[in-house]
Regions:
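Acidic, surface-exposed loops and disordered segments
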Residues: 2-391
Length: 391
């Protein structure tokens, strides 16, 4: 849920020069001059963002009845780097949620905390999607192994929770936000007044957290192993999206139409270019336009899978509430990714103490996100179909 890819650039040309100096429209014109624009536009799906089979799960899930329909909602949940680290064992009377050990991010998530948060997000969507199908869900967390959770199903009245109606409108928004402050009552509504969500709104605290996020991004890309593990989930082309149906894609980066078109038409970028662009984007767009930050915390003495699963369920609810209110949300986990990396390498920096100074005493940070009023709607990103995730 952290690193975003860079818009590609021609060999020897900086993407910052292409998309900022020349402008996106100029970038498109430059490619058009080669005589290949029509084919490249078709091949890169420039004219049909969000189309193709990789996006079909967003369109098809509501019409599917029973437990498989609920799984169809689950696969639309948020996950780290869009890894979709889930599998499901489906029966008429229960759905088991399982972790897929092949879909991790390595050194970026060495303790699998982010993976478990993603599983919690899927679990929340699954639970929301059962009642409209006449199924009453009862959740039992099984944090000691696999499955990680079981949802028992019994017949019940067909009722719809308001959050169910926005499941297919919820998308991570990495674009700019408007300079519109969010009222305290709005933030409380987003979190459901859950004390596990700590809001960072004060100007000084928000600036301090913004600097932390930029510093953590710089540290992450300077760590070769983390940089490589991040970039492994970048799907550089439309063909990559259709083949993998997961990962970080250009449609999910919050670009305007012309900028997105230019990015898709230009050749794929290198890892080093992508790293540099992400740091720049973090500083110049994400931090610069955040109206507020939320930090999902656990008690300082609690760091287990059950807590991570519940945090994922909470994050999914916050994001769905935000969607229902026209508010954008963007997870930014580079600080905790660096803290976990330091724990595995035996190193230390000032990131931990600086973040702790912004949080209530006795809490442990699990994930950070920014919120704000979006400049433009976020686009859907690829999803694997239900058939690919049912064990």
């Amino acid at each position: 849920m952290t690193t975003e890819p860079a818009p590609p650039a021609p060999p020897g040309v900086s993407r910052r020069h292409v998309l900022r100096g020349l402008g996106a429209a100029t970038g498109v014109a430059a490619v058009a001059a080669t005589g290949l624009l029509s084919y490249r536009a078709y091949d890169a799906a420039v004219l049909d963002p969000g189309g193709g089979d990789a996006h079909a799960p967003w369109r098809d899930w509501r019409a599917v009845p029973g437990p498989l329909g609920a799984v169809g909602a689950a696969v639309l949940a948020a996950s780290p780097h869009n890894t979709q680290p889930w599998r499901f064992a489906v029966a008429d009377d229960a759905i088991d949620v399982l972790a897929d050990p092949t879909r991790g991010t390595g050194s970026v998530d060495p303790f699998s905390r982010e993976r478990d948060v993603g599983l919690g997000c899927a679990l929340e969507n699954l639970v929301l999607a059962c009642p409209p199908r006449g199924l009453s869900p009862t959740v039992t967390l099984l944090p000691g192994g696999d499955p990680v959770a079981r949802v028992a199903l019994t017949p019940g009245p067909a009722v719809t929770h308001p959050l169910y109606d926005v499941i297919d409108r919820r998308h991570t928004d990495r674009g700019p936000f408007r300079a519109t402050p969010l009222a305290p009552a709005t933030l409380e509504a987003l979190s459901g007044a859950d004390p596990a969500v700590h809001w960072v709104v004060d100007t000084a605290a928000r600036a301090a957290l913004g600097r932390l996020l930029v510093d953590a991004a710089e540290a992450l890309v300077a760590d070769t192993e983390q940089s490589v593990d991040n970039f492994a989930w970048f799907r550089a082309t439309h063909d990559d999206e259709e083949r993998h149906r997961d990962g970080l894609v250009l449609d999910g980066q919050g670009f305007g139409p012309l900028q997105l078109g230019a990015a898709k038409l230009l050749p794929p970028s290198s890892r080093a270019e992508g790293d540099r662009f992400w740091v720049d984007r973090t500083r110049d767009v994400h931090v610069a336009t955040a109206a507020a930050y939320g930090v999902v915390t656990t008690p300082a003495d609690t760091d287990d899978r059950a807590a991570h699963l519940e945090a994922g369920r909470l994050l999914q609810r916050v994001h769905l509430r935000a969607t229902s209110l026209g508010i954008a949300l963007h997870p930014m986990n580079q600080i905790t990714e660096r803290l976990d990396r330091e724990a595995t390498t035996g190193t230390a920096s000032d990131l931990g103490p600086r973040l702790a100074a912004l949080l209530p005493a006795g809490t442990r940070p699990l994930l950070v996100f920014r919120v704000g009023v979006p400049v433009r709607p976020a686009r859907p990103t690829p999803r694997r179909p239900v058939a690919a995730v049912v064990a």
